[in-house]
Amino acid sequence: MFKSFDGLKLSNSELEGRYIIANRDIDIGESILKCKSYFAVTCEDFKKNSCYNCIKLIKSPSPQQVPRCFGCNEVWYCSEKCKQDNQAKHQHYECAFFNNIKSPKLIQNSKLDFDSYSEIRIILGLLSRYYQDKLLNNKFNSSIIINNQQDDEEDFIKDTLDGVLDLVENDINEETNSVAKEYIDNIIEYIINILKLTINNNSNDNNNNNNNNNNNNNNNNNNNNNNNNNNNNNIEELIKLIRPLIQKVRCNQFGIWTKNDKCIGMAVSPSSSYFNHSCIPNCESVRDGSDMTFKSLFPIKKGDQINISYLALDKSTKRRRDYLKFGYYFHCQCPRCNSTDIDPTGKLEDSLDNWISKFYCHQKKCTGLYYSKLKLSLQSLTNIDNHEIQLSCSTCNDQLIVNSNFYLNKPNY
């Protein structure tokens, strides 16, 4: 699965599900994995000034110069090239579904808040691909989806729709999270109405066109009935997918952040989702729009699990666990969160806090981590003079100069 990424091995356990372990010793600053998001959307409050294709801020001086989709009026682009590259996946049912997101028929009775529309768009986008790929048997061209970047295609993992459908999900119900369940129920109802409105309207348009072009009423009626039955069956199959997709996406999505630490988009990348969380991660995701590169923060031994963090790390154990429980529906049992259980004196907790805090970005309000852009081995560190190791923040790209002692005295856990 991981192609040329020879240092990775996919493992599985009943407690942790699927996760990635190091298949060899991994050095500082290694590019562990490169992924192109299978699907990404801009956030609702940034959709007019962020490109829907590359998920980067638009630098155009005026809104009138920003290309957009006039079919749905829900997506904007940084250039005509990005708009053209995106048409292969957007011009079919995704555009039609998006066009009805703000339908007056739906909004007037809606219980949703502003931010809900970002989640609705990512679910509708995935449903549109399933509808086109699985139900209509109109396959996507994967080479088009990755924007025709043939030069670096081999460096990136290719994710698929089947990979999304195979993602692990956490059941969100009255017992696990009653507030989230009610919220999701409202989103599901809204999406169902969009599906029915879109598919039935498109079917009615097609039926009317057929009737106008053919005088055989009996044949037309039979064809119309068959189309209606097929549409109802397709809608029912799509409806069955909505809740599982929401639960999969909520547990596995990645935020796409600007250098100012603003979340402008959300992405789903199945291969990236194999990285489990730890509050003392040994790996960090470096994002470039909807693309991600995972870099090792410090040396990783063969057999160690490779982890990333799902949250800002400069919080107390309680706040971190509460955030993960509410947002990702699990109780964190990482070494840092469990440190007080292992060592009631607090010494282990202090040593782990001190170790990982060295990697926190120094810029105010930035939640990124410092990593080395260059691959460095522990052996080579002894030959590096003071102030020769340059680190970069994964979010804001702030630079930090450290010496070889920065990587020494890593606590055992």
Curated annotation (Swiss-Prot):
A zinc finger (MYND-type) spans 51-95. It comes from the Eukaryota. Residues 205-232 are annotated as: Disordered. The keyword Zinc-finger applies. Keywords: Coiled coil, Metal-binding, Methyltransferase, S-adenosyl-L-methionine, Transferase, Zinc, Zinc-finger. Residues 6-311 form the SET domain. One of its GO terms (cellular component) is nucleus. One of its GO terms (molecular function) is zinc ion binding. SMART domains: SET. Gene3D superfamilies: SET domain. InterPro entries: H3K4_H4K5_MeTrfase (IPR050869), SET_dom (IPR001214), SET_dom_sf (IPR046341), Znf_MYND (IPR002893). GO terms for biological process: methylation. SUPFAM superfamilies: HIT/MYND zinc finger-like, SET domain. Its EC number is 2.1.1.-. Residues 216-243 form a coiled coil. CDD domains: SET_SMYD. Probable methyltransferase. Belongs to the class V-like SAM-binding methyltransferase superfamily. This is SET and MYND domain-containing protein DDB_G0273591. It comes from Dictyostelium discoideum (Social amoeba).
